[in-house]
Amino acid sequence: MPGILRAAGDVQRRNISAFRTHDWRDHFERLGKGIIIADTASMMLQHWTTEGEMRLYPTSVPLTDELTKRGYTEVVEKRKNPGWAPTPSMRERNPEWPAYVEGGDPTNPLGTRALYLSWTYYRIHGTQDTRKIGRKSSNGCIGLYNRQIEEVYDRAPIGTQVKLI
C-alpha cells in the first residue's frame, strides 16, 4: 500500500509499482548534466535529465552485496552494442565462460547499450535475458531492459552523476 506523504512525515514514498522513489536533492547538490540513482534494495533506477524530468525503470541487481559498490560515481563512457569480457574474478568463479563476446551477439550479457562508470568493471547496461529484471542476477552491474537502457543512453550524457544505494 502506498505511503501517505506528509510534510514532516518519515513515510517511505512508493509509486504504484511499489518502487521506493528518491528526491535527487537528498543525494546531490545540483542536477548538473543529470542524475541517476540506482537503488539495489527496490531494484529500480531513477534518471533525471538536466531539465529535471524523472523517469523510473525496473532493474536487475547484483546477486550479493559483496559483488557491487555503493556510493557516488559518474558516467565516463557510453557504448552502443558493447563487447563484453568477464572480469578476472568472474573468470575465476566461472572458468568455462568465454574470454570475450562481441557486441550484438545474442549471448552478450551487456545488451544493446552500456553506460561505463568511473569505477572499474561497473556498468549500467541492457540485457538479452529479460528474466533477470527485478531479480538479484548480476555480477555487480545494474541491468535494464534493452529498450529502457536505450532510452537512458540517449538521455544521459557523459558526466551524468550516479549514486548506487
Which positions does each model-derived feature cover?
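Short, mixed charged/polar active-site loops
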Residues: 53-56, 70
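N-terminal twin-arginine translocation
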Residues: 1-14
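Exported/periplasmic cell-wall-interacting domains
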Residues: 31, 66-71, 79, 83-165
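N-terminal post-signal-peptidase region of extra-cytosolic proteins
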Residues: 17-35, 39-40, 55-62, 95-104, ...
